Amino acid sequence: MNQSILSPFGNTAEERVLNAINAFKNGTGVLVLDDEDRENEGDLIFPAETITPEQMAKLIRYGSGIVCLCITDERCQQLDLPSMVEHNNSVNKTAFTVTIEAAKGVSTGVSAADRVTTIQTAIADNAVPTDLHRPGHVFPLRAVNGGVLTRRGHTEASVDLARLAGFKEAGVICEITNDDGTMARTPDIVEFAKKFGYSVLTIEDLVEYRLANNI
């Protein structure tokens, strides 16, 4: 990737990662780009612990509509969330579990507020499997242990960023799309970020930062 296009968001990987961590700490979303030879997409990511209905509405409006809750394997086990399929043969091994809905406090589960309620229910410290109905309108993703150092995916990036910002290891993500329904690529993501004031970083930035700081 031509790094100069990302210079408005920091001149180095460390600057961009630190800007993203600070944005997370302030409860603001960030845009994360993966490798051009992978999905070549940009996801808008929020800390699961602080996401608001207004932020969820923005994800739904400007994203693909598939809003995902990225959580650790430990959390998946706590909630008894099995994989969506027995044999995952997707290209990038995206680790969807069964979909979920909060058992209480929601109506149809589709609205922004309902999805936030489902997420809050799922990440609660004392959450148990019966707190959730299955299926639902939130798509959990199981992050691999080791984060982006093990798998260079948006799932792992969101969990890593949440941890680095001092939050529970859980992030909410959605792929950004263009007005015509096509997937937003790097130039589109940069313009989107400038329009709404988001930080931008790449998964490569996060890998480099973690390796350099041994975290």
Curated annotation (Swiss-Prot):
Signal peptide: none annotated. It catalyses: D-ribulose 5-phosphate = (2S)-2-hydroxy-3-oxobutyl phosphate + formate + H(+). It is an enzyme of class 4 (lyase). D-ribulose 5-phosphate binds at residues 38-39, 43, 151-155, 175. The keyword Hydrolase does not apply. Gene3D superfamilies: DHBP synthase. Disulfide bonds: none annotated. GO terms for biological process: riboflavin biosynthetic process. The record marks 137, 175 as: Essential for catalytic activity. Keywords: Lyase, Magnesium, Manganese, Metal-binding, Riboflavin biosynthesis. Binds 2 divalent metal cations per subunit. Magnesium or manganese. Its cofactor is Mg(2+); Mn(2+). GO terms for molecular function: 3,4-dihydroxy-2-butanone-4-phosphate synthase activity; magnesium ion binding; manganese ion binding. Mg(2+) 2 binds at residues 39, 154. Pathway: Cofactor biosynthesis; riboflavin biosynthesis; 2-hydroxy-3-oxobutyl phosphate from D-ribulose 5-phosphate: step 1/1. GO terms for cellular component: cytosol. Mg(2+) 1 binds at residue 39. InterPro entries: DHBP_synth_RibB-like_a/b_dom, DHBP_synthase_RibB. Its EC number is 4.1.99.12. Catalyzes the conversion of D-ribulose 5-phosphate to formate and 3,4-dihydroxy-2-butanone 4-phosphate. Belongs to the DHBP synthase family. Homodimer. This is 3,4-dihydroxy-2-butanone 4-phosphate synthase. It comes from Haemophilus influenzae (strain PittGG). The gene is ribB.
